A protein has these predicted regions:
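Class I S-adenosyl-L-methionine
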Residues: 1-119, 129-135
């Protein structure tokens, strides 16, 4: 059980991803199982809660290709953190901390990512593929 707003960010169905939603979706399928109003607790907190469930938990996205899953997971989070490092900057510019401009351009072309894209605009599945392409 987490704050309702945290659960909603983890599920992120509004097309605006976050580091949290991408991290959760890389390992499973999140869903809100129940919402719990603040009044259900004594003393009542100032916020509502939600039961966040992550179905189909696995490392399947990181088990194929070269390298150990642990190394691939570390690289994935390095790329994601670089992408979200400066929220107002374009994604390509942020990713220069994790990969060369040439690799970034090739990956953007491959996945048809706009050069004007920001980190929050990229779906979790694309982040997984993008991180792999930037290895």
């Amino acid at each position: 059980m987490v704050q309702k707003e945290v659960a909603e960010r983890a599920v992120a169905r509004d097309g605006k991803e976050s580091i949290l939603s991408i991290a959760v979706k890389a390992f499973g399928v999140p869903r809100i199982a129940a919402k719990v109003p603040a009044g259900a607790f004594r003393p009542a907190p100032k916020v509502d809660s939600a039961v966040l469930v992550v179905d189909n938990v696995s490392r399947r996205h990181f088990e194929h290709g070269g390298g150990l899953p642990k190394e691939r997971i570390k690289h994935f989070f390095t790329v994601v953190h670089a992408g979200f490092a400066h929220k107002r900057k374009l994604l390509a510019r942020n990713l220069e901390a994790a990969a060369s401009k040439e690799k970034i351009k090739n990956a953007f072309d491959l996945f048809e990512i706009s050069e004007k894209a920001r980190a929050e605009d990229i779906l979790a599945e694309t982040w997984i593929a993008l991180a792999e392409a930037l290895r």
